């Protein structure tokens, strides 16, 4: 199930986040934010094939930090100097609708419902503040041509908070080559799974005759 929950938010006095999470927990119904059918198709296929926690979020590579600063209303990109790779080029801020992303309680290391963050939605709306456990993750999305899946394994190093912004709790993901990710990514909307799942994704996509391109 999916609706254009942001751009058509004026039709409702709330957001569908909690309803979608309840529907997933009750019947494993896959949800789609912002009417992104390609993300929803990717999420459906990978979740059914791999049976791993997965959600859609926004990617903000450090190499393109300008849009992140503007879109999320944050003053600077997260400080990564304390991580194993101190090169900021190889990091991505991941955030969606004020927090890390929309995931059900069974996927989260922590999970809390919060008041809305974005100005575009009704004052009665809500958002989900949840986290994956830190550690290995995989970013993936079907290419618009539907002929290949773009994917990369990385590490969720931690979280960054920016009070008063549109990113109250975002994830900080390390990837092997930030330049390669920027060249290969097809959208700012991407799926993120727990664990390193590239090999399993290659096997699953082979069933559908779909290739896998590593970013």
What are these regions (language model features)?
Residues 2-215:
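Anaerobic metallocofactor- and corrinoid-dependent redox/one-carbon enzyme cores
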């Amino acid at each position: 199930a999916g609706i254009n929950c942001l751009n058509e938010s004026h039709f409702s006095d709330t957001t569908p986040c909690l309803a979608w999470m309840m529907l997933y927990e009750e019947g494993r119904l896959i949800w789609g934010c912002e009417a992104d059918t390609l993300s929803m198709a990717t999420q459906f296929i990978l979740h059914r094939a791999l049976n791993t926690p997965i959600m859609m979020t926004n990617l903000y590579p450090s190499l393109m930090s300008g849009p992140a600063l503007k879109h999320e209303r944050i003053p600077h990109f997260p400080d990564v100097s304390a991580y194993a790779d101190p090169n900021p080029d190889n990091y991505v801020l991941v955030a969606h609708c004020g927090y890390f992303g929309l995931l059900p309680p069974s996927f989260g290391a922590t999970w809390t419902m919060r008041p809305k963050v974005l100005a575009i939605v009704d004052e009665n709306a809500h958002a989900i503040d949840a986290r994956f456990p830190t550690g290995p993750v995989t970013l993936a999305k079907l290419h618009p041509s539907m002929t290949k899946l773009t994917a990369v394994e990385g590490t969720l190093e931690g979280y960054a908070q920016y009070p008063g912004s549109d990113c109250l709790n975002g994830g900080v993901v390390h990837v092997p080559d930030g330049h390669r990710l920027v060249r290969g990514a097809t959208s700012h909307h991407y799926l993120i799974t727990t664990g390193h799942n590239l090999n399993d994704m290659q096997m699953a996509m082979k069933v559908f005759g779909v290739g896998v391109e590593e970013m």
